[in-house]
Regions:
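Conserved Nudix-box catalytic region and its N-terminal flanking loop in Nudix hydrolases
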Residues: 17-56
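A generic structural signal for short hydrophobic patches within well-formed alpha-helices
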Residues: 111-112, 124
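Charged phosphate-binding loop/patch that engages nucleotide di/tri-phosphates or the phosphate backbone
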Residues: 119-136
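Conserved N-terminal beta-strand and adjoining loop/helix that marks the start
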Residues: 1-19, 39
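Active-site-adjacent beta-strand/loop module that shapes the phosphate/pyrophosphate-binding cleft
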Residues: 61-62, 70-94, 102-108, 120, ...
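HhH-family (HhH-GPD) DNA N-glycosylase catalytic core used in base-excision repair
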Residues: 55, 61, 130-132
Length: 136
């Protein structure tokens, strides 16, 4: 059996909007949109990894709220797990610091106006269902 490496993604929500991040690197992912996040380090809880990754990538203080049902395979040995998250009071506004060049808050009706990374689409669909919007 192969060990899997968990990648955490944040469905960062604010006033019914979802934060999407446009990749700037690596070149094969640049220009596509994703849920921000990253790899869980050995010995780290996924929720702690999510908080750390959001601070590193977006400069924010956020907290995981609830795990989104599902687990989505990425390039082996990685697997994506997603949590809803929110900004903590007093947090700075998100800004692209690492691996991204643009951020966008998407309302439910605009969720599919950006070209999501294929690997993130199933997770975004699940988040969309939780927001009460039509899946695509």
């Amino acid at each position: 059996m192969t060990d899997r490496t968990v990648v955490v993604g944040a469905a960062l929500l604010d006033a019914g909007r979802l934060l999407a991040a446009r990749r700037s690197a690596p070149p094969e992912l640049a220009g596509r949109w994703e849920l921000p996040g990253g790899k869980v380090e050995p010995g780290e809880r996924p929720e702690d990894a999510l908080t750390r990754e959001l601070a590193e990538e977006l400069g924010i203080d956020a907290e995981p709220v609830e795990r989104v049902p599902g687990e989505w395979p990425l390039k082996s040995p990685y697997v994506l797990r997603v949590w809803t998250a929110r900004l903590r009071p007093g947090s700075a506004a998100p800004r692209p610091l690492q691996d991204h060049d643009e951020l966008r808050w998407l309302t439910p009706e605009r969720l599919w106006e950006v070209p999501w990374l294929e690997q993130d689409v199933p997770a975004v669909r699940e988040v969309a269902a939780r927001l009460g919007t039509g899946a695509r």
